Amino acid sequence: ITKYKHEIMWWMSRLTIMVTSLFLSMTLAAQAYAAEIQMGSGGNLVFEPNEVTIDAGETVTFINNALPPHNIIFDKFASLSRESLMFTPGETQDIKFATAGDYSFKCAPHEGAGMKGVIHVK
């Protein structure tokens, strides 16, 4: 019976480690992801939502919803820009914002149609 008790304890310790690891990884992933912005939402040339507020260090995911091509241009923060055109619906770009401030962005091909937005970083 001691052998079985030892084996059960071994499996329980492994299960505890796995569950704890899973919980921690989910918590860390949730902390890093702050907002999702759709591009071309509802068949319109818009960012949806076109304004979000996040904390410094968080990431915004841009998703090409439809009506390609789209890109993401930050006029005052060129290093954050994603100038390459996104053609495939479902294609994503993740952008991390390390510093507090207001980050205005646009889609260069559709700026004239009003495809603009702002990310407020606290």
What kind of feature is each model-predicted range?
Residues I1-T2, A66:
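A subset of signal/propeptide-processing and intrinsically disordered low-complexity segments
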Residues K3-Y4, A29:
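Serine/threonine-rich, low-complexity intrinsically disordered segments
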Residues Y4-V19:
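Bacterial N-terminal signal peptides that target proteins for export
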Residues W10-S13, L28-K122:
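Extracytoplasmic copper-binding redox domains, predominantly the cupredoxin/blue-copper superfamily
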Residues M18-T27:
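Bacterial N-terminal signal peptides
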